[in-house]
Amino acid sequence: MLKLPAALTHESAADFSQTLRQAVLSQPAEVVADASALTEFDSSALAILLECRRQALAAGKSFSVQAAPPRLRQLAGLYGVGGLIPVTA
């Protein structure tokens, strides 16, 4: 499981993106991003999650987000990408 940090904004996205790329490759067939710690974020968090999804699917793995904050789900809907980022309880 990939654990998202408490803050994932434009300022931290580039650094975290590198870490996430490596983590996706090390995951088994199902890649799950745990967003339970995420409290401060902007649209960069969506970009990171979409990139993670793209990498997982390219590697033949499934992708989902666990415990996404309501505001993140709202932001995904606003940008029209809510259907691309499956959220589990």
Q: Each PLM stretch: what is its role?
A:
Residues 1-41, 50-89:
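STAS-like cytosolic regulatory interaction modules
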